[in-house]
Amino acid sequence: LSFGYTVGLFQLESAGMRDALVNMKPNKFEDIIALVALYRPGPMANIPVYNKCKHGEKQPDYLHPKIKKILEPTYGVIIYQEQVMQIAQILSGFTAGEADILRKAMGKKKSAILEKQKEKFINGAVEKGITKETAIFIFRKIEPFAQYGFNKSHAAAYAMIAYQTAYLKTYYPNEFIAASMSNELSNTEKLSEFFEELKRLNIKVQRPCINKCFADFVPKENTLYYALAAIKNVGYEAVAQLVQEREKNGKFKSISD
């Protein structure tokens, strides 16, 4: 993942995501969860901040000592909806239910409800000994993240699938790419990306052969056998008949067969 070799990996294969992975150099599962949540409009701007703090190039800003524990796992960057709710509870004395109302108001951009929630957040923080200026500053920080943010469980589920596909590609590259390419038979642009990956991985490609290939891409040792159904204007039904004939009467010997 740290090298950006993520073609075919769930959630991680776009060019922008590859660049983010190379810069982040994830070394724990939590990094993948964070990146899945951050790689969205709004929070995306904070990927460089997360990376710099992770690598010790920048000091994390925890906004207030009372919420340091909430923001410490994400290097001071507000990423998840749960963090927004926890901040409201710790700083302003919101109940869990009230914090969820705040989250919904931000997510749905309901200005009337949000204005009431903002006032409640600031007043609650002031009652707990926080200056009004600090409360306003923190509210302005959490507002844009709540609009676009994932909840952590959602991001974790995506990250788990991404990690599982990365594992399969790392330890079973030929099998993984064969399955991935078989799902993209008509997508020539995507197939081209996979062929470049095969070159990088030093996996040979068996050209289309009526006596060796099948409808889908098939992995055998260090060779990937081309999918006959991926040939333009050749469908699964025609290939199925060819394979059936080959298995019944042996290899084709001439065009007249």
Regions found by a protein language model. Give the residues of each.
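Noncatalytic, beta-rich nucleic-acid-contacting surfaces in large DNA/RNA-processing enzymes
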Residues: 1-257
